[in-house]
A protein has these predicted regions:
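Alpha-helix initiation and N-capping motif
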Residues: 151-154, 234-237, 241, 309, ...
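Solvent-exposed soluble domains appended to multi-pass membrane proteins
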Residues: 268-280, 290, 295-648
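N-terminal leader/auxiliary helical segments
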Residues: 3-30, 34-52, 174-182, 195-196, ...
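A diffuse structural propensity rather than consistent per-protein peaks
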Residues: 8, 137, 141-147, 169, ...
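Transmembrane and membrane-interface helices of multi-pass
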Residues: 2-231
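Membrane-interface segments at or immediately adjacent to transmembrane helices
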Residues: 213-287
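Extended hydrophobic/aromatic-rich secondary-structure runs
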Residues: 52-59, 237, 241, 248-265, ...
Length: 648
């Protein structure tokens, strides 16, 4: 083996190019000047390096060291990119070793298709670092990590990416510079496996062994999706692998056709005991799922220069009003609309999954199909692109008669980059006014105005609200958007107060926004880490109301969850509950709120994880999970009593 330095003019040219690249990074992200100088010196030395290896056993040993060492280096660089020193220190050694093995599997699989170990290392390292970079920005934008189920959401993410600011920190710059040095070094090592078939067999065998070992060691490991827990508890690469595992839904304990039949026998009536049937005319039902609409005071108290939502706060007649648990934070809106429309819960699905893109069947029974079965015309409105979250495919399957997307709205009526709530509500009014005589109308609308992020400034948006004391620009913009939503809401309610036909309006937020961590720390004293279950559920709490333009009892609801809201809306409208909604109405008495994080225990007076449930609470949760599994995954034996879908 011979190692020598050979200085050439071409290396100086390469150095100049590399230093220009590094200088641009230095301009974008200020870091110590000695790092820039050190990078230049190392790069020039590496490019001037010549390595010659003749001994075949030394080549073999170098191949092994290069693959194993590169895997370990990549795994640690991923962690360095994503976590600060304090969080990096939290991961246990055995989990870090599993992350190295995950990276090694990638290297081995790539090696099967290449003879050159250096090329394998470059491809594998760059692929894994780009992958980690995607997670770096995803976490920056939405406050939780990129996992396997997000792959189906790439088109949606790209469509709103322009509204976010892409910012690198110093760790990201160091990772980029170190990767450049690594690639330059590996290119200097020219070693190959001469016997390709033998090499492929060995690589595949080791990869299979690694996968089996990882599977055995992680059998009881939970995929983490909250904030950066996946990275500092499991390691990001391993956590992502676990999210792949979670896409396969297992049959719940105690599931059988006989158990479903027993439940059918309990809920096969007409539901008249649940609702008031003395209604002369079915009401028009309008649902507004308001993008990122939240009452941040549930997280902690704060002061503003003006009241944020004065009109919403003033509503008190003919209204059921309160707070509901969502299953998502900062993103994944369709899971909230799915919970509302179907009555199902994300509690029994893998963390981070998106139902619209993974689990929608050909016959998804919901409030849409139920209302359509009793003569309603069902309309969906969303002032954004139809391909977002695959809504253009999902909505017709759900049974909607009409769908209205961005091209059906006035695209000059924008606040920041999104169509305003006012324009959405005017479109709702327009559709109501154009309805046929005796047409029963159901409108499901999803707004877009308040979508994150909240850091960029816009000439078409005058921010009126600001927090007093510590001020955060993203929080001020978000609260100002809520203030605009409140004005639009007043228009919507005022209009339908004046019409003669009965109208019910259901309004709720899909999830809380992802804002500056320090802002949350000012609210609850902790930020987003180290929270109790009750404090964590506060971040998943959104406001809701069910209002009618005719006389109904005013009711305050301390806590419920989105999966119950459609049942509550049907009850309030005087419409007979289908069997599944009857079940949910009964369950709500014992389990008033349930979401992806846990449930509210009436007996204990606090939130708990599902696995902590005992007695009657556990029985209701088990029945719920059995029915949801039957609905979504046991198509051959799907209950026609609970899930009739469309009857016409």
């Amino acid at each position: 083996m011979k190692i020598r330095l050979k200085f050439e003019k071409t290396n100086l040219i390469r150095l100049i190019v590399a230093m220009i690249f590094a200088a641009v990074l230095y301009y974008k992200v200020t870091f110590p000047i000695y790092v820039l100088a050190g990078f230049g010196a190392c790069y020039f030395l590496i490019k001037s390096l010549e390595i010659e290896i003749n001994n075949k056993w030394l080549k073999l040993a170098l191949n092994v060291v290069l693959l194993g060492g590169s895997s370990a280096m990549t795994a640690h660089m991923v962690q360095y990119l994503l976590l600060d020193a304090e969080l990096r220190a939290r991961i246990m050694d055995n989990k870090m070793f599993l992350n190295v093995l995950c990276c090694l599997v990638v290297y081995l699989v790539v090696q099967v298709f290449t003879k050159n170990v250096g090329l394998t290392c470059i491809i594998s390292h760059m692929a894994l670092m780009i992958f980690a970079g995607i997670n770096y920005f995803v976490y920056l934008f939405r406050g939780n990590e990129f996992i396997f189920s997000d792959l189906r959401s790439i088109s949606t993410g790209l469509s709103v990416a322009g509204n976010y600011e892409f910012v690198l920190d110093d760790r990201a710059v160091y990772v980029v510079l170190l990767s450049v040095l690594y690639v330059a070094f590996v290119r200097k090592i020219h070693v190959k496996f001469e016997k390709r078939l033998w090499m492929a067999v060995v690589c595949i065998s080791i990869a299979v062994f690694c996968c089996a070992y990882i599977g055995t060691e992680t059998e009881g490991t939970v995929t983490e999706t909250w904030e950066q827990k996946g990275s500092y508890r499991n390691g990001y690469i391993l956590n992502y692998v676990l999210s792949i595992r979670d896409c396969f839904i297992a049959e719940p304990d105690g599931y059988s056709e006989e158990v479903v039949t027993e439940l059918e026998n309990q809920y096969s009536g007409d539901g008249e005991s649940y609702v008031n049937q003395n209604i002369e005319k079915k009401p028009t039902i309008i649902v507004v799922m308001s993008e990122s609409y939240a009452d941040l005071s549930v997280v902690g108290d704060f002061l503003t220069n003006e009241q944020v939502t004065p009109y919403y706060d003033s509503l008190q007649d003919n209204i059921m009003k309160g707070h509901a648990l969502s299953s998502v934070f900062g993103a994944k809106t369709p899971n909230s609309e799915w919970e509302y429309m179907t009555g199902n819960s994300m509690a029994f699905l893998p963390s981070g999954s998106v139902v619209y893109q993974q689990y929608i069947s050909d016959t998804p029974t919901s409030i849409v199909s139920n209302l359509k079965n009793i003569g309603y015309t069902c309309v969906a409105m969303h002032p954004y692109y139809e391909t977002g979250w695959s809504r253009n495919a999902v909505y017709p399957t759900m049974g909607f008669d009409e769908t209205h997307f961005i091209d059906d709205f006035d695209q000059t009526k924008l606040l920041r980059k999104y169509i305003t709530d006012q324009e959405l509500y005017e479109s709702i009014v327009e559709r109501y006014e154009s309805k046929k005589t005796n047409e029963d109308l159901f409108i499901m609308s999803i707004s877009m105005q308040n979508h994150g992020g909240y850091t960029e400034k816009y000439p078409n948006f005058n921010e009126q609200i600001r927090t007093l004391g510590a001020s955060y620009s993203d929080a001020n913009q978000y609260l100002s958007l809520l203030h605009e939503s409140d004005k639009a809401l007043e228009y919507l309610i005022s209009y339908f107060q004046s019409v003669d036909d009965p109208v019910e309006i259901v309004f709720f937020g899909d999830h809380q926004p992802s804002l500056n961590t320090n802002f949350y720390k000012g609210l609850n004293g902790k930020g987003l880490s180290g929270l109790t279950e009750d404090e964590l559920e506060n971040l998943y709490t959104v406001p809701f109301f069910i209002w009618t333009n005719y006389e109904t009892e005013t009711e305050e609801v301390p806590i419920t969850s989105l999966n119950y809201l459609s049942t509550m809306a049907l009850e309030r409208a005087g419409i007979a509950l289908p069997s599944y909604n009857q079940f949910l109405a009964d369950m709500q008495q014992t389990i008033p709120a349930i979401n992806s994080r846990g449930y509210y225990s009436v007996s204990s007076g606090c939130f708990k994880h599902l696995e902590e449930a005992t007695g009657e609470e556990a029985e209701w949760i088990d029945r719920y999970q059995i029915l949801q599994y039957n609905n979504m995954f046991d198509k051959k034996k799907q209950s026609k009593v609970f899930f009739p879908y469309l009857q016409n």
